From Swiss-Prot:
Domain of life: Bacteria
This enzyme's EC code(s): 2.1.2.10
Lineage: Bacteria, Pseudomonadati, Chlorobiota, Chlorobiia, Chlorobiales
Record keywords, A-Z: Aminotransferase, Transferase
This protein's GO CC annotations: cytosol; glycine cleavage complex
SUPFAM superfamilies tied to this protein: Aminomethyltransferase beta-barrel domain, Folate-binding domain
GO BP of this protein: glycine decarboxylation via glycine cleavage system
Gene from which the chain derives: gcvT
Protein name in UniProt: Aminomethyltransferase
Amino acid sequence: MKKTALSAWHEGAGAKMIDFGGFLMPVQYSGIIAEHKAVREAAGLFDVSHMGNFYVRGERALEFLQYVTTNDLGKIVDGQAQYTLMLYPDGGIVDDLIIYRVSADTFFLIVNASNCEKDFAWLSDHVGGFEGVTLENRTSELSLIALQGPKAFEVLGRVFPEAGLDKLASFHFATVPFGGAEAMVARTGYTGEAGVEICLPNEEAEALWTALMAAGKNDGIQPIGLGARDTLRLEMGYSLYGHEIDQTVNPLEARLKWVVKMDKPNFIGKQACQQVELDPRKSVVGFSLDGRAIPRQHFKVYNSDKQEIGEVCSGTVSPTLQEPIGTASLLRDYAKTGTPIFVEIRGTFQPGTVRRLPFVHADRP
């Protein structure tokens, strides 16, 4: 099993470690609810170094990425990032990812840990038609640290006092020196709160981590495991590969039409999306349950006549709302906010209601 450059720190801090995407990762430290609360109210630090990262370079790099992704990369400039998807020809999702434009011929991609090898192979399979474009997998060399929460920029400013990082716009990034290397600091995240994700060489990761923890000590900063990362993203309704999205799901049936630019020239999966656009049958929605039972992935969802209308994608008890919440893929006729539903849990039908996403309106400036 692979380890990140911060594994020894996590173990020293008493984290409960699990296998996630082939990496030994912290699932929790003090506890999911306390960690979740720290991010919503103060600041939290996440090791997300298991995520895959690639460089795409060459004069035709933009043309290549436009072909293999759904969003319009032509709309962003140097120092800007974009959320996007890679699709199979049938419209199923290869992965969701963020692309960072370093320059006109250099792009940096961050992909899901569980899809890293698959994604690199997919890109490699399609790059041949774009002469001069090179792919470079840097996953094993780089660490990724996320600092999230309403006090994130106060903490960041103590470690990088001259960088003016609080002025970064959403989905923009800057490169700043740290130790003997450069760190890429991007105003992105997976929590809904203000914050950044910082990419830097493994050799400098622990020094940055400990500096941020020390800088946030009086603000209540906490290290955050994958457990709270999941409850935070679910409160925001953000997709997780293998749950809301996968190779069987078309983005137009998963609340992701906004990243599929049909007016862009041909891209892989475009024709399939055009077909679904004519008659989308399903939609991913948020819901809450009336009782205390917790909905889990693949649990069946029914209408008031007890007819099956879909299944749960993700579920948890919201630490903020203190009630069971989830996402579900439902037939579109039942996707309207306020629609009554029933989730089958251990042989019982638990009543609930379709809810508007996000569940929580985080204080993101």
